[in-house]
Amino acid sequence: MFRAIAIIRAHEVIDAVPASHIVLERDERHLRRKAITLENGEKILADFAEPVVLEHGDRLVLDDGREIEIRAASEELYEIRGRDPRHIAELAWHIGNRHLAAQIETDHIFILRDHVIRVMLEGLGATVTDVVAIFSPLRGAYSGGHQHHHGHDHDHGHHGHDHDHHHPDHE
């Protein structure tokens, strides 16, 4: 089984035709070590030192030099629109406050479908439409793959009250 040993980001791809491709949903595009079956039926092993997030158009470089194109799957999403840019920002805040993955554009937001969230957003005045599209949400503050050390606990005001919590992964 050939191994994927490097990534070429979509904006760095030169016009070479890929040897094959694979279609992956958002959750499947976040990986570190995983066997993957390509569209041509061949199996490869993605084998990276750290977790990576693959985006539509990225290429995996195999240990034999071939390039495999990543294609983002179309997924069932909500397209959320607000009255104006400020309203969209408020809606984005509510979505982020619930720790939901979101693709935020200038005039709309995409999220994975969830009926409870739809009711909440409509209650906040949003127009919510069912769509099927590629989902490329923003990566969170902790998804950069770097390590940092705090050496202390945090006090956070959250949900109208203060509470302490400790980050054992940062020690």
UniProtKB/Swiss-Prot annotation:
Lineage, uppermost ranks: Bacteria, Pseudomonadati, Pseudomonadota, Alphaproteobacteria, Hyphomicrobiales
Family: Belongs to the UreE family.
A GO-annotated cellular component: cytoplasm
GO MF term list: nickel cation binding; unfolded protein binding
Cysteine pairings via disulfide bonds: none
Keyword line: Chaperone, Cytoplasm, Nickel, Nickel insertion, Virulence
SMART domains tied to this protein: UreE_N
Pfam families: UreE_C, UreE_N
Stated name of the protein: Urease accessory protein UreE 1
Function: Involved in urease metallocenter assembly. Binds nickel. Probably functions as a nickel donor during metallocenter assembly. Disruption of the ure1 gene cluster suggests that it protects brucellae during their passage through the stomach. The major route of infection in human brucellosis is oral.
Region described as Disordered: spans on this chain: 143-171
Ranges of biased composition (kind: Basic and acidic residues): 152-171
Major location (coarse): cytoplasm
Alphabetical GO biological process terms: protein folding; protein-containing complex assembly; urea metabolic process
Superkingdom, natural source: Bacteria
InterPro entries, sorted: UreE, UreE_C_dom, UreE_N, UreE_N_sf
SUPFAM superfamilies: Urease metallochaperone UreE, C-terminal domain, Urease metallochaperone UreE, N-terminal domain
Compartments, record wording: Cytoplasm
